[in-house]
Curated annotation (Swiss-Prot):
Coiled-coil region(s): none
Encoding gene, per UniProt annotation: glsA
GO biological process, one term: glutamine catabolic process
Keyword Nucleotidyltransferase in record: no
Subunit structure: Homotetramer.
Molecular functions per Gene Ontology: glutaminase activity
Organism: Pseudomonas syringae pv. tomato (strain ATCC BAA-871 / DC3000)
Binding site for substrate: 61, 111, 155, 162, 186, 238, 256
Family membership: Belongs to the glutaminase family.
EC number: 3.5.1.2
Protein name: Glutaminase
NCBIfam families: Gln_ase, PRK00971.1-1, PRK00971.1-2
Keywords: Hydrolase
Length: 302
């Protein structure tokens, strides 16, 4: 596997230079776009990596999966009274659909849905940002994981559209907490700094029927893990979930920091990172690397 990962990275490196980093978040705009890393965490506990797999990056929307798992853990099926699990077919920060559907987000991976999940968690935890950080630390077994306060503040200063979504949902009585407090927590979650190895390990429980092998803790039931994977498969890649299913064939979740996590049920979890994004906001080179990996080892679930 180690040799295969290096071979795949060599094959996709010519694509470096295409795409564009997420400069609409100023703190992310200065990230070097020529970086590329990948890690695979098997259900047997083995870790394989190549390239810049130990370089920290901002996980951004990948954090939405962690928030969702926290909410399911303490509230179960009740969360679906406030949001759905359908693909949106609209931009991840769309307000039009939210207005039309009376403040009920389509799924937990568009921004409005993630804010509802954060609102649910805010009511549950005394210190939501610390609870999230500690949860992620336990999932990956790395107690040095932190949130980048500069990235979080940069996002908070450009919060207008997210704030608009939150206040719109509040007008439909689907947002109960203080908007500014929830936004602060949301951006701290997005600003978690992790590397490919950390993220591959942190998502291992979703490839293992909800069981985190290295900690010995059942994070979700097997059924719940399957449900989370299904939402990742249909809604995890912004407006490119269909293309990702066609090319890679795995449940996945991306972030504008350039990371993509993919789940191989019963087998492994994978994280690839390269900061330059395509037009849909997903890592251009990362998509290509995952496509090659899935094809070489026949990992598609379809």
């Amino acid at each position: 596997m180690h040799d295969l990962l290096n071979e795949i990275l060599d094959e996709v490196r010519p694509l470096l230079g295409q795409g564009k980093v997420a400069d609409y978040i100023p703190a992310l705009g200065g990230v070097r776009p020529d970086q590329l890393g990948i890690a695979v965490y098997g259900n047997d506990g083995q870790v394989f990596s190549a390239g810049d797999a130990e370089t920290l990056f901002s996980i951004q929307s990948i954090s939405k999966v962690f928030s969702l798992v926290q909410a399911i853990g303490h509230s179960g099926e009740d969360i679906w009274q406030r949001l759905g699990h359908e693909p949106s077919g609209q931009p991840f920060n769309s307000l039009v659909q939210l207005e039309f559907e009376q403040g009920r987000p389509r799924n937990p991976f568009i921004n409005a849905g993630a804010l509802v999940i954060c609102d649910i968690n805010q009511a549950r935890f005394a210190a939501p940002s610390l609870s999230m950080r500690d949860f992620v630390r336990r999932l990956c077994g790395n107690r040095s994981i932190t949130s980048d306060s500069k990235v979080a503040e940069s996002e908070y200063q450009h919060r207008s559209r997210n704030a608009a979504a939150a206040y719109l949902m509040k007008s439909f009585d689907n947002f109960h907490g203080d908007v500014e407090d929830v936004l602060r927590s949301y951006f701290h979650h997005c600003a978690l700094s992790m590397n490919c190895i950390d993220l591959a390990k942190a998502f291992g429980f979703l490839a293992n029927q909800g069981f985190c092998a290295h900690s010995g803790v059942q994070i979700l039931t097997a059924r719940q893990a399957t449900q989370v994977n299904s939402i990742m498969a249909t809604s995890g890649l912004y407006d490119e979930a269909g293309n990702f299913a066609y090319r890679v064939g795995l449940p996945g979740k991306s972030g504008v920091g350039g990371g993509i996590v993919a789940i191989v049920p019963e087998r492994a979890s994978v994280c690839v990172w390269s900061p330059a994004l395509n037009a849909a906001g997903n890592s251009l080179v990362g998509m290509a690397a995952l496509e090659k990996l899935s094809a070489r080892v026949d990992w598609s679930v379809f």
